[in-house]
């Protein structure tokens, strides 16, 4: 039996005041306090020069297969302002998940806080 794709339209949002407080805490300290249970792989690193030092927001997560960005296209319409789009594609680095048009749409139209690929 195939599981198929699942898209959840509702999610519980964190308190905005708590999210704002995370802008003052280094990510490494947060990971240490949480027993590193929510830490990302160290191969994930900054590849741009953001105007702000901290990228903080509720995560909008997307899991897809290598070479398949259908769930990512759905996320383009579902994520909102201030969200951090977190995309997993089974660690495939042979194909691009998104290009300049999608990035510009997320940044300027959707006004998300950032993207983690």
Regions found by a protein language model. Name each.
Residues 1-63, 70, 77:
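Intrinsically disordered, low-complexity regions enriched in acidic/Ser/Thr/Pro/Gln residues
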Residues 50-103, 112:
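A glycine-rich, hydrophobic loop/mini-helix early in the fold
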């Amino acid at each position: 039996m195939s599981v198929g794709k699942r898209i959840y339209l509702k999610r519980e949002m964190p308190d905005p005041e708590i999210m704002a407080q995370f802008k003052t805490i280094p990510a490494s300290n947060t990971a240490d306090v949480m027993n590193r249970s929510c830490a990302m792989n160290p191969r994930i690193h900054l590849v741009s020069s953001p105007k702000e030092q901290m990228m903080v927001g509720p995560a909008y997560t997307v899991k897809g297969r290598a070479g398949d960005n259908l769930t990512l296209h759905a996320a383009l319409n579902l994520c909102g302002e201030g969200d951090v789009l977190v995309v997993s594609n089974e660690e495939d680095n042979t194909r691009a998940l998104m290009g300049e048009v999608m990035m510009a749409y997320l940044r300027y139209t959707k006004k998300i806080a950032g993207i983690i690929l």
